[in-house]
């Protein structure tokens, strides 16, 4: 289905836009624009960049403070196409999570203040001097949702007035391993992945719509189904009803697979939907694998070993009919369809 055409090394989390790769390189922590062959097309003058974000319009990053190495308040914004400087100044913004952005607007909140910032103009739209708890997991049309285990906090997006805080532990009493990992907006509900299970809550009043008492770390939403592939298990949840389906497999366990005469456990943590298949990252004691799973039958359609990696797969993404795979050793593998 896919063949590897390029491996780029020493690269931190990347962004892919208009056929170009934007990434912080490990060598000097300098942000670079790369071609798909790894050629450097542009690089920022600033080094030791801490956090960065790139979209269609801008490149934004920050450096550590000159006074405090644990504070990152030297912020730079460049026009992505022209590479001209839009903004340079001392402002503490939370850039490490893509979930804090909604288009060109950044919703940056800390235990000190809240800053709603236009990254296209380099302009503060609103600053609110009040602390907020936790980490931002979701920005919707109306709300900003943060988590601080075992609570979620739902704020009005425009002014960060608190709508509701809710203890997710109430739905899983006695479960010590509960941890809020992901939150999704689905119709008029929130889907909360809480490690020990999944809950679906009304956005209006927080009431329980349904609950799934099965281990979950991640979910891939396709239509009205949520697909969970965690450790060795694989199952599907109907997001309207909460109906659980494990493909008639005991303990929802995926079958072992054989590759080049060796048997492997299909242990991984996430599936990604693309062109009718679920693409699953698999960890083994030697090399990682990618398995394409039919979401209707749960059967394997394609198995590929990444022999040039000895680490875990971090992410699988698809852009312009190419597959991009990163591992935990800062490598990016680019695949093209055969």
Predicted regions and their residues:
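N-terminal "mature head" segments of proteins
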Residues: 1-91, 118, 122, 126-128, ...
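Repeated scaffold domains used in trafficking and secretory/extracellular systems
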Residues: 7-19, 45-58, 90-103, 129-142, ...
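Solenoidal tandem-repeat scaffolds enriched in leucines and small polar residues
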Residues: 107-210
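Structural motif
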Residues: 28-33, 67-77, 111-116, 149-155, ...
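Short loop/turn segments that connect beta-strands within beta-propeller blades
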Residues: 35-38, 79-82, 118-122, 157-160, ...
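A short beta-strand motif characteristic of beta-propeller blades
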Residues: 2-8, 38-44, 83-90, 123-129, ...
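Blade-level signature of beta-propeller repeat domains, shared across WD40, Kelch, NHL, RCC1
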Residues: 307-338
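Short beta-strand elements that form the blades of beta-propeller/WD-repeat-like
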Residues: 18-26, 57-70, 102-109, 142-147, ...
